[in-house]
Regions:
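Redox-cofactor binding/interface segments in oxidoreductases and associated redox assembly factors
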Residues: 6, 113-114, 157, 240
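Hydrophobic alpha-helical segments and helix pairs
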Residues: 87-145
Length: 273
């Protein structure tokens, strides 16, 4: 059994995130912990002195409808009971919401949150600054899900030969061995005539975790058409590593992943060391 964080912020209840948690529970029983956060992270509003300590300034609380949050918690608990999911409910009142979520992630196997609704009250353009921060700071893998999407039945492994890409793929296989028989495509980018990076080693590893594995190298001139292709194949779950880090290749760059998140078309699994 795995511990899954299901994240809700402010007055938002993500139907897409709950749908994914329910799907995972149908594959294998999980413990789902509903984390209900403050509607704003006050860290950005608090001043810091030259020693790095928070300055004692007055901060006006962001308006929150406590009754809505309480109602969302009740909906979460009722739905978990109806689905037969073991659950816990955490009402996190820490003013530094993202710091609290990072702490929660330290004690979880995976986090699920809405790539569409996460702190949309701060900025509706995703990935907004809050989502970017938690993608960098999380201490467990994240499943990003849109609000309206098809449940995945295939896997797309983004591989550039670098350690973070391999780490993400291994984390995915450890968490979801039940997807062994799914059609899986491992893709990499051909740059300057380079060969498939560490092909023998990568194929040796991946073939033991994915029964229906194919490897594909995307030429540089076909990169744009590949980006279009992936957005139209909504039955895939994309596995990628190290969002926002310089180690990402051109094919799986920060801007590419941001475009996928912005498009609200795919489930994305992100993991980093």
């Amino acid at each position: 059994m795995k511990k899954v964080l299901l994240v809700f912020d402010g007055n938002h209840f993500s139907e897409g995130a709950f749908k994914m948690a329910n799907f995972l529970n149908e594959q294998e029983a999980i413990l789902v912990t509903g984390v209900f956060l403050q509607p704003i992270d006050y860290r950005d509003l608090v001043g810091y002195n030259s020693m790095g300590a928070a300055s004692p300034i007055s901060v006006t609380p962001y308006p929150t409808d406590e009754s809505t949050i309480t109602k969302n918690m009740a909906i979460f608990e009722e739905r978990c009971e109806h689905a037969g999911m073991e659950f816990r409910t955490h009402r996190d009142t820490d003013m530094f919401a993202l710091q609290e979520l990072q702490r929660e992630s330290r004690f979880a196997d995976i986090m699920i949150l809405s790539s569409e609704m996460f702190y949309e009250n701060i900025n509706k353009d995703q990935p907004n600054e809050y989502l970017k921060k938690i993608l960098r700071q999380t201490e467990c893998p994240i499943l990003l899900v849109p609000e309206q999407y098809s449940l995945p039945s295939k896997i797309l492994l983004a591989y550039d030969g670098k350690p973070d890409a391999v780490f993400a793929i291994k984390q995915f296989t450890y968490l979801f061995p039940q997807f062994y028989n799914w059609d899986t495509k491992l893709i990499t980018l051909e740059e300057d005539g380079d060969e498939f990076p560490h092909q023998d080693l990568m194929e040796e590893l991946a073939a033991k975790h994915f029964a229906n594995l194919t490897l594909e190298m995307i030429s540089d001139e076909n990169k744009k058409s590949f980006h279009t292709w992936i957005k139209s194949h909504k039955d895939y779950m994309l596995v990628a590593g190290a969002y926002g880090r310089s180690e990402l290749s051109n094919l799986f760059s920060k801007s590419f992943l941001s475009d996928i998140i912005t498009d609200h078309s795919l489930t994305v699994f992100v993991a980093h060391k």
